[in-house]
Amino acid sequence: MRRCMPLVAASVAALMLAGCGGGDGDPSLSTASVSATDTTTLKPAATSTTSSVWLTLAKDSAAFTVSGTRTVRYGAGSAWVEKSVSGSGRCTSTFFGKDPAAGVAKVCQLLQGTGTLLWRGVSLAGAEFGEGSLPGTYGSNYIYPSADSVTYYKNKGMNLVRLPFRWERLQPTLNQVFDANELSRLTGFVNAVTATGQTVLLDPHNYARYYGNVIGSSAVPNSAYADFWRRLATQFKSNPRVILGLMNEPNSMPTEQWLSGANAELAAIRSANASNVVFVPGNAWTGAHSWNQNWYGTPNGTVMKGINDPGHNLVFEVHQYLDGDSSGQSANCVSATIGAQRLQDFTTWLRSNGYRGFLGEFGAASNDTCNQAVSNMLTFVKNNADVWTGWAWWAGGPWWGGYMYSIEPSNGVDKPQMSVLAPYLK
């Protein structure tokens, strides 16, 4: 799906074209971290053989404390040793009885329980804008949100910012070093936001493409995207408040081709000894409603069970809109219950296969039906927190102008949708 629309930037005199936020249009349709003292019950399926969520608890040699008896692991990258810990412990090979990764810096991570969503936040768009002008000019074609703007969302109760950006700007040439200026913008935002206790979800907003060439093709082999992620993971592996989102909305490719690329990228991330949580999308714009459908090829629900994370710390990211074709281009929502309905099959898949999910994009205009649909959707996610880890609204950011889904405040005034989200931020 393509959600392109004109926008107004305060720093730019003319109207510009925004980069497309994503979505999951389906042609078959007609119409932050949790603290060490978290005491929620462990999800039975969350083991090292399925989709666990491990959040960093302590750095090498540091002491830590857990409430009750919890599963803690010690290591780095893909090398770990697990231990059931009651009370206090220390992030050392002596305490865990083994050095799983000799010669590298290690951390201790806590296996997260269920019952409370880990992340609730918003995509702050801007750095992915101007996709027709790559790499483009900063301040004219695209903009990073300011770290200060995140304070508004934090004060509302959000603890996660999803940051869309373009691969081509960060790495203008495949397999080569990152552009210093773009890297500075990216790391500056991430470091400032995570320093306040927020989590940042990195989102290469490229639809599984680089200058229009699909990942897994001869022009953009899997090894090139693996190189990108190896470099990016190295930048942020010491920051446990950074989540690595593999890609925004892969589409129009064999699902098997996307799986191959995703597995290559996961291997590259873990080879950099990065222990961060990784969010993995599916094919077909990673639509929740179409996860088990075959109109785009072999269903995600079949193929993505072949995912292989050597670090055993992944979450599946899906997107879901509420209009007739799930594209997120309409102000109308199908019904007050459509959001929960469209998440149902994916939720069953998560639970049946021992995985966890994150609702990485959803949004709607402000009207009675849509407000009810959003509320029912978020209630559904909350009530299924044994497999759901959280959500991020699409979108906020400085250049949206009158975009119907935007929750960026206008002159300090909340957008109407914020009142719908507010009960789920307590």
From Swiss-Prot:
One of its GO terms (cellular component) is plasma membrane. PROSITE patterns: GLYCOSYL_HYDROL_F5, PROKAR_LIPOPROTEIN. It is a lipid-anchor. It catalyses: Endohydrolysis of (1->4)-beta-D-glucosidic linkages in cellulose, lichenin and cereal beta-D-glucans. The keyword Signal applies. It comes from the Bacteria. Coiled coil: none annotated. Residues 20-45 form a propeptide. GO terms for biological process: cellulose catabolic process. The keyword Lipoprotein applies. Its EC number is 3.2.1.4. It is found in: Cell membrane. Disulfide bonds: none annotated. GO terms for molecular function: cellulase activity. A lipid is attached at C20 (N-palmitoyl cysteine). This is Endoglucanase.
